[in-house]
């Protein structure tokens, strides 16, 4: 997969893995899986999620292309399972100015995966359920979804992209 334009400011940088035959070592996936990750280009640039180690090189190439020489301000981590969060520490090392956004449980799991020193406390933006983060024209709002899959899962929406019709 290469970079996909989702909108004028949002780019898909995820990777399609057609070589994997079992998801989580037990569920057949005859056509593979997609590791979804996005870059939001605004006054401050945010990367949403990383990908599995299997796809690191292609993903980093996509991220580099999407950033076009700029540096991200934030990495938003929605879920720490390795197929989503395997490259958190790697990306943080590549961009030492970048802050990492997650909830308290996210960082607890991150320390278990990468060690407490992987993401320095001053680089962590710990969000609460319903809090928002402005990138400029885009404002990300975080909604916790514990046990949708794992206890730390959260989702993000950008209200500027939601279109609601007026009642008739």
Give, region by region, the residue ranges found by the protein language model.
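Active-site metal-binding motif and surrounding structural segment of the metallo-beta-lactamase
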Residues: 54-101
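Structural motif
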Residues: 45-46, 74, 162
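Conserved small/polar residues in nucleotide/adenosyl-binding loops
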Residues: 162-168
């Amino acid at each position: 997969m290469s970079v996909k334009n989702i909108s004028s400011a949002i780019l898909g940088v995820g990777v399609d893995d057609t070589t994997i035959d079992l998801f989580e070592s037990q569920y057949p996936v005859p056509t593979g899986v997609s590791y979804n990750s996005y870059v939001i280009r605004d006054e401050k640039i945010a990367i949403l999620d990383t990908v599995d180690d299997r796809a690191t090189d292609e993903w980093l190439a996509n991220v580099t292309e999407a950033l076009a020489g700029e540096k991200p301000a934030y990495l938003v981590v929605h879920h720490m399972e390795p197929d989503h969060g395997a490259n958190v520490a790697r990306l943080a090392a590549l961009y030492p100015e970048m802050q990492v956004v997650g909830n308290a449980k996210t960082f607890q799991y991150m320390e278990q995966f990468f060690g407490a020193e992987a993401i320095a406390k001053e680089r962590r933006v710990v969000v609460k359920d319903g809090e928002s983060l402005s990138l400029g024209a885009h404002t990300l709002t975080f909604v916790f979804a514990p046990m949708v899959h794992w206890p730390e899962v959260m989702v993000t929406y950008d209200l500027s992209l939601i279109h609601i019709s007026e009642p008739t």
